[in-house]
């Protein structure tokens, strides 16, 4: 799974990550892409969406790279507040946040099932060279 925000610089990094995973010598399947901080929704206007960092950047990248789009997570104050008290925001009941996390979870499980039904187990990435690495000093 690759997670990106909608900003161009973040999308460029996500694109590089996908390309790395898809290299023949690495060959790690990408389950899909999630767009974090997709839009801002103020608590007092829960129906309003403000696309502060761009719109559907990760969704467009998923289409371009032919990998599934798993969903988007908004910026809302309750995510920060839940994190501050150690309670996962995904455990909120009947909120836009819980709906977003539930959608990402459902899509991820669906893609995992497809991956397991159609692809062999992923092999461990083997390190074949130490070029560019420093020796470890003990």
Kindly give the residue locations of the regions a language model identified:
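Conserved catalytic-core segment of NTP-binding enzymes
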Residues: 1-84
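C-terminal boundary of histidine-terminating zinc-finger modules
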Residues: 83-98
């Amino acid at each position: 799974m690759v997670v990106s925000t909608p900003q161009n610089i973040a999308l460029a990094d996500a694109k590089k990550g996908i390309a790395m995973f898809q290299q023949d010598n690495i060959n790690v399947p990408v389950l899909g892409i999630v767009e974090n901080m997709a839009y801002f929704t103020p608590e007092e206007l829960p129906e309003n969406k403000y696309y502060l960092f761009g719109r559907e950047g990760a969704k467009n990248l998923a289409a371009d790279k032919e990998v599934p789009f798993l969903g988007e997570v908004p910026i809302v104050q309750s995510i920060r507040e839940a994190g501050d008290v150690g309670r996962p925001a995904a455990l909120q009941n009947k909120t836009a946040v819980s709906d977003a996390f539930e959608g990402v979870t459902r899509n991820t499980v669906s893609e995992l099932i497809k991956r397991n039904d159609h692809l062999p187990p992923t092999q461990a990435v083997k390190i074949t060279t130490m070029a560019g690495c420093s020796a470890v000093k003990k």
